[in-house]
C-alpha cells in the first residue's frame, strides 16, 4: 500500500512539472500599467516597443525595460508610436512545441488507460501485482517462523492426528517408507462437521513440517474473468513444483470441487473449468512427485467423484465431534491461558457438554472468562462456566423484556408440561434446566441434557421425544382450554412432524410400510445435480405415509395428555416454582416429581424459602403410562424445547 502511494505521488509530481514546462513563459522585468506607458510615449521617453499580441515589451531611452498590456484594442496606438519616432517591432505569437502538442492530444487517452489499469488492480486485489496478473495463484507460502501451532495444540482427535502425522514423518524421512515400497498419499481430505478443528489440524501440520506450506481457500480460484480459475490452479502447482517437497492446503474445497452435472443456465461453468484443471494437476499425464495436497470440507457429499478417487485424494480423514475424553483434552488446551479457580474440573465440564465441537468448547472458555471479567473476579470458577454453558445452549437471557403475569404463567405451564413428560416417558434425556426467563428468541426454555455420547436412537426414544415436544401445548390446552392455546408450540409441532415423517419414510418404523425408503432425494440443483427428480412412490403410498405420520403423532399426543392429566398436582406445583424462582434445575425438578418441598436453587436470595409442591394427601409417586425411564448412557440426543 505504501509503495503504491509513493508511486502515484511521483507520477503526480512529474505531471505537474510537465504542465508547468509546457505553460506560457513569463516575461522578465517589471510591469507597468498602460496609462503610464502612453504618458511616457507622449513625453518622448520610449525608444522601442516590441508588440506580441496584447503584450508590449518597452525599452526606454535610458535603457530601462518593462512590460505592459493593452487592455482593449487601441487603433491609435501605432500612429502615436510612429509620431514619436518609437521603433516598433512586431513578434509572432508563441507556438506550442511539438512535444507539447503531442502530449496535449494524447493526454485524454493516456488518462483513460491509467484509470482502467487502476481499477483493474483494485478489482483483482492486486495491491502489489500487475494489471495482467489475474491468472497468478493467490496461495501464500508459509515459513516455519510464521506458524507457531503444533500437534500439542490439537486435542480431541487422536486418530486424525495420527493420519496426518504420517505425512509429516514421510516428508522428514522418506527413505523409511520407500525401502518397503510404500508411497505417501498424494492427497488427504479432512472431513467433519464445522468447528471440529480441520483448519487447526492443517495449521499444526504447517507448524510441524519443515517443508514449504502453501495455503489457499477454495473461493480464491474463481473470479470475474473467464479462465482465471484454471490459470491459478496451474500457477499454484508450478510454484509447488519449484518448492517440492511441499504441502498445499485448500480450505473449503467444496467451493471449487462441487459435483459436475446439469445445473441451471446451460452456459459455460467457470467452476467446472477450474475443477477439471485441478483434476489434471493432481493426477494427470504428468505426475507431481513430492507435492501433497490437503483439503478440508464439511460437505463431502457434494464433491465430484473424480476428485475423491485414489490417486487424487487417496485418504479421507474424518474429524468428528469429540467424545467426553476428547472434550476434556480440548478444554485443558484452551484453559492454559485462563486463570482458573481451584474448584475447576475439566472432566465435569466435559461430561456436561455432549455434542460440543472444539470451536464450541473454545467459545465456552472464552464466555466463562468474560463472565468473570464482568464480575471483577481474578479467576474463573465453575459458576462462570455454568453460566457460559447455559448461554451457549439456551441463548442469552433477555431480562429487559417485559412480560405480564398472565404471560409468565402461561409460559410456566408450557415449560412445565415439557419437563414433566420428559421425566415420565422412557428413554428420554434427563431434564437439565427449566426457565421462564426469555432466552434467545424463546419466551422460555426446557433443556434436556443427555447423559453420554449417542450414536443412534431407538424407536422408543424417538416416540418419547415426540410426546415431550407436545407436552407444552397440551399443558396450555388442559389449563386454559382449546380456545386459548397459544402459538408458542409452533416450533415444537414442526420438529415433531419432521421426526415422525422421518420415522415412517426413512427409518422403517411403520408396520404398514415396512423397512423401505420413501423419502425423496433432497440434493440442491446448484450442486451440479440433475434438475428433474424421479418420483418413487404412488399417490396411494403417499396417502398411507400421511396416515401413518398422523397416527404416530396422535398416539404420542394422547399418551402425553394422559400423563399430564394423571399428574396435574405436579404441573401446578412446577408452575408455582417457576413463577417464584424463574429457573429451576434438576434437584428442584426431582423434588417436584417426588412431591416433596422444593429446595431453593443455588444462590437464591431467600435460603429459607420453600414451595410445598405436594398435595394435602400422602405423598405418592407420579404415574407414568409406560415403564419408568431408564438412563441410556450412550445417547447424546438433546432438545432445546420451549419455543413458547
Curated annotation (Swiss-Prot):
Acts as a processive, ATP-dependent zinc metallopeptidase for both cytoplasmic and membrane proteins. Plays a role in the quality control of integral membrane proteins. One of its GO terms (biological process) is protein catabolic process. In the central section; belongs to the AAA ATPase family. GO terms for molecular function: ATP binding; ATP hydrolysis activity; ATP-dependent peptidase activity; metalloendopeptidase activity; zinc ion binding. This is ATP-dependent zinc metalloprotease FtsH. It comes from Escherichia coli O157:H7. Zn(2+) binds at residues 414, 418, 492. Residues 598-644 are annotated as: Disordered. InterPro entries: AAA+_ATPase, AAA_lid_3, ATPase_AAA_core, ATPase_AAA_CS, FtsH, P-loop_NTPase, Pept_M41_FtsH_extracell, Peptidase_M41. Residues 632-644 have a biased composition (Polar residues). Homohexamer. The chain crosses the membrane at residues 5-25, 99-119. The keyword Transmembrane helix applies. The keyword Secreted does not apply. ATP binds at residues 192-199. It is a multi-pass membrane protein. Gene3D superfamilies: 1.10.8.60, 3.30.720.210, P-loop containing nucleotide triphosphate hydrolases, Peptidase M41. PANTHER family: ATP-DEPENDENT ZINC METALLOPROTEASE YME1L1, METALLOPROTEASE M41 FTSH. Residues 1-4, 120-644 are cytoplasmic. It is found in: Cell inner membrane. Binds 1 zinc ion per subunit.
Amino acid at each position: 500500500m505504501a509503495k503504491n502511494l509513493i508511486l502515484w505521488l511521483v507520477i503526480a509530481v512529474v505531471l505537474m512539472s510537465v504542465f508547468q514546462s509546457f505553460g506560457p513563459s513569463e516575461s522578465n522585468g517589471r510591469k507597468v500599467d498602460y496609462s503610464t506607458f502612453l504618458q511616457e510615449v507622449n513625453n518622448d521617453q520610449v525608444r522601442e516597443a516590441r508588440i506580441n499580441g496584447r503584450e508590449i515589451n518597452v525599452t526606454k531611452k535610458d535603457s530601462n525595460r518593462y512590460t505592459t498590456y493593452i487592455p482593449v484594442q487601441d487603433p491609435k496606438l501605432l500612429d502615436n508610436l510612429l509620431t514619436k519616432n518609437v521603433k516598433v517591432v512586431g513578434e509572432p505569437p508563441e507556438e506550442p512545441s511539438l512535444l507539447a502538442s503531442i502530449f496535449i492530444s494524447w493526454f485524454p487517452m493516456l488518462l483513460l488507460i491509467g484509470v482502467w489499469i487502476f481499477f483493474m488492480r483494485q478489482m483483482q486485489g492486486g495491491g502489489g501485482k500487475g494489471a495482467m496478473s489475474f491468472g497468478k495463484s493467490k496461495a501464500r507460502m508459509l515459513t516455519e517462523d510464521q506458524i507457531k501451532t503444533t500437534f500439542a495444540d490439537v486435542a480431541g482427535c487422536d486418530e486424525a492426528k495420527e493420519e496426518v502425522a504420517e505425512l509429516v514423518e514421510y516428508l522428514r524421512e522418506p527413505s523409511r517408507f520407500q525401502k518397503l515400497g510404500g508411497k505417501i498419499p498424494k492427497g488427504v481430505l479432512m472431513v467433519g462437521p464445522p468447528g471440529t478443528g480441520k483448519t487447526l489440524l492443517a495449521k499444526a501440520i504447517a507448524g510441524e513440517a519443515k517443508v514449504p506450506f502453501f495455503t489457499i481457500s477454495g473461493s480464491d480460484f474463481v473470479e470475474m474473468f473467464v479462465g482465471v480459475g484454471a490459470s491459478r490452479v496451474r500457477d499454484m502447482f508450478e510454484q509447488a513444483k519449484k518448492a517440492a517437497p511441499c504441502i498445499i492446503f485448500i480450505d473449503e474445497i467444496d467451493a471449487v470441487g462441487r459435483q459436475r452435472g446439469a445445473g441451471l443456465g446451460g452456459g459455460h461453468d467457470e467452476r467446472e473449468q477450474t475443477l477439471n484443471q485441478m483434476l489434471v494437476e493432481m493426477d494427470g499425464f504428468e505426475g507431481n512427485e513430492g507435492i501433497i495436497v490437503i483439503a478440508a470440507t464439511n460437505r463431502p457429499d457434494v464433491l465430484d467423484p473424480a476428485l475423491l478417487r485414489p490417486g487424487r485424494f487417496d485418504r479421507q480423514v474424518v474429524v468428528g465431534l469429540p467424545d467426553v475424553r476428547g472434550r476434556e483434552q480440548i478444554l485443558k488446551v484452551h484453559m492454559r491461558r485462563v486463570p482458573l479457580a481451584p474448584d475447576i474440573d475439566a472432566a465435569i465440564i466435559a461430561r456436561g457438554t455432549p455434542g460440543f465441537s472444539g470451536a464450541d468448547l473454545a467459545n465456552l472458555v472464552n464466555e466463562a472468562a468474560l463472565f468473570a471479567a464482568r464480575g471483577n473476579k481474578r479467576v474463573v470458577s465453575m459458576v462462570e462456566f455454568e453460566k457460559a454453558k447455559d448461554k451457549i445452549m439456551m441463548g442469552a437471557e433477555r431480562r429487559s423484556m417485559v412480560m405480564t403475569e398472565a404471560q409468565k404463567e402461561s409460559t410456566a405451564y408450557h415449560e412445565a408440561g415439557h419437563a414433566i413428560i420428559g421425566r415420565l416417558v422412557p428413554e428420554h434425556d434427563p431434564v437439565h434446566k427449566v426457565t421462564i426467563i426469555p432466552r434467545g428468541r424463546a419466551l422460555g426454555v426446557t433443556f434436556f441434557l443427555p447423559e453420554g455420547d449417542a450414536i443412534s436412537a431407538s424407536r422408543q426414544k424417538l416416540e418419547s421425544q415426540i410426546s415431550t415436544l407436545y407436552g407444552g401445548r397440551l399443558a396450555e390446552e388442559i389449563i386454559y382450554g382449546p380456545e386459548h392455546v397459544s402459538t408458542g408450540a409452533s416450533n415444537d409441532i414442526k420438529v415433531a412432524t419432521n421426526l415422525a415423517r422421518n420415522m415412517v419414510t426413512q427409518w422403517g418404523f411403520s408396520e404398514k410400510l415396512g423397512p423401505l425408503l420413501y423419502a425423496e432425494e433432497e440434493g440442491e440443483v446448484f450442486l451440479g445435480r440433475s434438475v428433474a427428480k424421479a418420483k418413487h412412490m404412488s399417490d396411494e403410498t403417499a396417502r398411507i405415509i400421511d396416515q401413518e405420520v398422523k397416527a404416530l403423532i396422535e398416539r404420542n399426543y394422547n399418551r402425553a395428555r394422559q400423563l399430564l392429566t394423571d399428574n396435574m398436582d405436579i404441573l401446578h406445583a412446577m408452575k408455582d416454582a417457576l413463577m417464584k424462582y424463574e429457573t429451576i434445575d434438576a434437584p428442584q425438578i426431582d423434588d417436584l416429581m417426588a412431591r416433596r418441598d422444593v429446595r431453593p436453587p443455588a444462590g437464591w436470595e431467600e435460603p429459607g424459602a420453600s414451595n410445598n409442591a405436594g398435595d394435602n394427601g400422602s405423598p405418592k409417586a407420579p404415574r407414568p403410562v409406560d415403564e419408568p425411564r431408564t438412563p441410556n448412557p450412550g445417547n447424546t440426543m438433546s432438545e432445546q424445547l420451549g419455543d413458547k
